[in-house]
């Protein structure tokens, strides 16, 4: 690992309106429920976001693809530099950057590559290319360590072909390793499934990838693993680490006596509720249709299911929902695991009863709403979950929904961004508004900015070359406020998109990861911008 304070080449051409507001974005999709909301945004409103007042304010180049969502800390005290708002960017080249969130100036850059290691991979599959470094969104604990900590999982390999998965804890101000890190990810779990040996399945780092964002929950860093390049053997791992020591604290495998069942989730972090339960959607894999007396798979294999994981006393499956045709869906590769899970706020139904719900969707175009207190388990004849909205999305989901003001927003592959209203704790069976634009594979993962319940904007990135940033009125998605193709002379163009992008919207800024850096958007000054570009040398 190396720490670099990089030199900069800065080309100035725009006036940038800045804010001293104190909002942080420390985890994937803004909160552990994964709602994608920032309800403290007072600068960007439907009245202030238009092509004449809003646009690209800079591009912060990096040394690899930015698949992870950029994170943000406000008012960070930097030794010798005063107080700055800081943007944290992780790349597939195994680098983590701390940037001045307004100018893009590099505060520090840390390489997580070990000596003689590389992020190049001879497997050359299309899932994560051309490098295999940092794919998952890190998580920040501002209260831990001397200056706050950013936790990152990095993958690499050496010249002998050995692969490494490591959990790092970096000082948020200095970029240095903390707690004796990094911690090499190793695990085993009782079972006779794929890749097992002597009665245990074994975590083989070359077979796995940490795609889903990290979850910080009650002092634990929870990691969830899927296949590297869809190459067997692999199973479904969830591994927790103590946030203060990086020691492994608990292990769960959700297909220990079968195969597959990876945690893909389009890069979405596992969701958590206020009671400390974790929710995931796993991919096609073994599901035991012989059930115990309490309705659980008799061999502990939960492939292609919506799973609730208890964390008290270690990781364990507390409840689940699987579709009646889960085995057939796995065989046809129409599983749930392509999308992310979201925990909804408590809702009141038509009978006045409080409902504790979560929502997810996968490749079959259904929206599945589950009651977190009784998810529905598996029934051979019909789905037993709280609400099943068939065909509402019109396409497969390789993305994550967002929530705002009793509305759920989904962007299925090849379809428009759609809004589904919630009344009496039930989602509308058809969309209540939709964007005019459609979003090619993999669809879009929206984010929301608002000031409380007012001035809601839904932000979405279109994955194409060049990528397109869209802003919609949250009340009516047919009302587009802005997109980055509207300005003349490619003023707001920002390069090719990535598969699982979600914008970071905070303190008057919008940040979008690309194949070679991060594009910054915000309110424009009186002069039309020509862009600010930061080149790292």
Residues covered by each model-derived region:
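Bacterial N-terminal signal peptides
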Residues: 2-15
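Blade-edge motifs of beta-propeller repeat domains
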Residues: 318, 490-492
């Amino acid at each position: 690992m190396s720490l670099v304070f990089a030199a900069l080449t800065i080309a100035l051409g725009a006036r940038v309106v800045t804010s001293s507001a104190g909002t942080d974005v420390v985890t994937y999709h803004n909160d552990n429920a994964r709602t994608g909301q920032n309800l403290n945004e007072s600068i960007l409103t439907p009245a202030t976001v238009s092509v004449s007042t809003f646009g690209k304010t800079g591009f912060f180049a990096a040394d690899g693809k930015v698949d992870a969502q950029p994170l943000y800390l406000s008012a960070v005290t930097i030794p010798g530099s005063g107080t700055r708002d800081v943007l944290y960017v992780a790349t597939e080249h195994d680098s983590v950057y701390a940037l001045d969130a307004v100018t893009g100036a590099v505060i520090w850059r840390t390489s997580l590559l070990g000596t003689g290691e590389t992020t190049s991979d001879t497997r050359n599959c299309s899932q994560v290319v051309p490098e295999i470094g940092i794919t998952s969104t890190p998580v920040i604990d501002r209260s831990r360590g001397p200056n706050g900590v950013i936790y990152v999982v990095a993958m690499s390999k050496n010249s002998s072909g050995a692969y490494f998965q490591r959990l790092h804890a970096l000082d948020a101000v200095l970029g240095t390793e903390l707690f004796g890190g990094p911690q090499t990810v190793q695990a085993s779990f009782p079972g006779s499934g794929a890749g097992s040996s002597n009665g245990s399945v074994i975590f083989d780092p070359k077979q796995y990838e940490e795609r889903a964002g990290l979850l910080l929950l009650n002092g634990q860093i929870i990691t969830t693993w899927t296949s590297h390049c869809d190459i067997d053997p692999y199973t479904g791992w969830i591994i927790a680490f103590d946030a203060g020591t990086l020691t492994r604290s608990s292990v769960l495998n959700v297909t220990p006596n079968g195969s597959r069942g990876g945690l893909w989730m389009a890069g979405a972090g596992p969701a958590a509720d206020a009671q400390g339960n974790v929710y995931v959607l796993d991919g096609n894999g073994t599901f035991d249709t012989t059930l115990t007396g309490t309705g659980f798979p008799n061999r502990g294999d939960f492939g292609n299911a919506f799973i609730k994981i208890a964390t008290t006393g270690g990781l364990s499956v507390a409840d689940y929902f699987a579709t009646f045709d889960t085995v057939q869906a796995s065989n046809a590769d129409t599983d749930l695991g392509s999308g992310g899970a979201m925990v909804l706020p408590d809702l009141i139904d038509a009978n006045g009863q409080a409902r504790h719900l979560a929502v997810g969707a996968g490749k079959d175009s259904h929206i599945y709403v589950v009651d977190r207190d009784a998810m529905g388990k598996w029934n051979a004849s019909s789905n037993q979950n709280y609400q099943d909205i068939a065909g509402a999305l019109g396409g497969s989901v390789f993305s994550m929904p967002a929530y705002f003001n009793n509305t759920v927003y989904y962007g299925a592959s090849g379809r428009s961004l759609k809004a589904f209203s919630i009344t009496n704790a039930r989602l509308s069976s058809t969309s209540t508004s939709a964007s005019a634009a459609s979003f090619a594979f993999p669809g879009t993962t929206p984010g929301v900015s608002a000031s409380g319940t007012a001035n809601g904007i839904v932000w979405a990135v279109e994955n194409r070359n060049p990528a397109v940033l869209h802003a919609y009125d949250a009340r009516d998605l047919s009302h587009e406020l802005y997109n980055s193709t509207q300005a003349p002379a490619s003023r707001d163009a920002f390069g090719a998109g990535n598969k699982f992008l979600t914008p970071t919207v905070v303190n008057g800024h919008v940040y979008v990861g690309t194949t070679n850096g991060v594009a910054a958007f915000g309110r424009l000054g009186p002069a039309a911008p020509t862009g600010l570009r930061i080149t790292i040398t």
